[in-house]
Amino acid sequence: MLKVSAPWLASLRDELNQTCFLAVWGNKGPTVVYVEASMGAVTLVTQIGSVLPLLGSSTGLVFDSFLNERETAALREQEMPLLSADQLRDVKLHIEQIRTTGVHQIQGLLMPGINAASSPLFAMGNKLVGVITVVGPGSVLNDETQNLAARRLLQTAQAISERMGGSRPSD
């Protein structure tokens, strides 16, 4: 998957001039395994080996939307008590939206001033194998540019998934 994804992420980074990364589901949750850093500021959340929150990051929410509940249950149970009732409602709405659109955009969820968009990668059997994310400062990745980034990210995720023989499962 990394070999297939890397050139696409480099191209997306060049087009958007924003940091792009690939995360896989590791034994502690969403884990960054590959980063194409932008020429601008590199954020702390985009280091290889970083483990991201399941319910508190765009990347994590995409994993939670498409992985089997048994795979995410332990981490979800760990994180849910840290969220308010409003935040838990938002998580549910985000998951419904992600399953429908195949992309998730968020502003400042994990770190204030840092915006992100994430999209799932599927392989044969339409199995979720990773999530790609574009991340950048809110001053640059604002509503208009974030929408463009999300569209290009979704197109890139679909192309990578097709290359691996998969596609987003339909409900």
Feature annotation, model-predicted:
Residues 1-76:
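Amphipathic alpha-helical effector-binding/dimerization core
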Residues 8-12, 20-21, 78-86, 101-108:
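Short helix-to-loop capping/linker segments positioned immediately adjacent to catalytic or ligand/cofactor-binding
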Residues 27-29, 139, 167:
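Residue-level marker for beta-strand->alpha-helix junctions and adjacent short loops that shape enzyme
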Residues 54-60, 147-167:
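Short, solvent-exposed cationic patches
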Residues 71-84, 88, 157-171:
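Cysteine/selenocysteine-centered motifs that mediate thiol-based redox chemistry or coordinate metal-sulfur cofactors
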Residues 84-157:
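Extended hydrophobic
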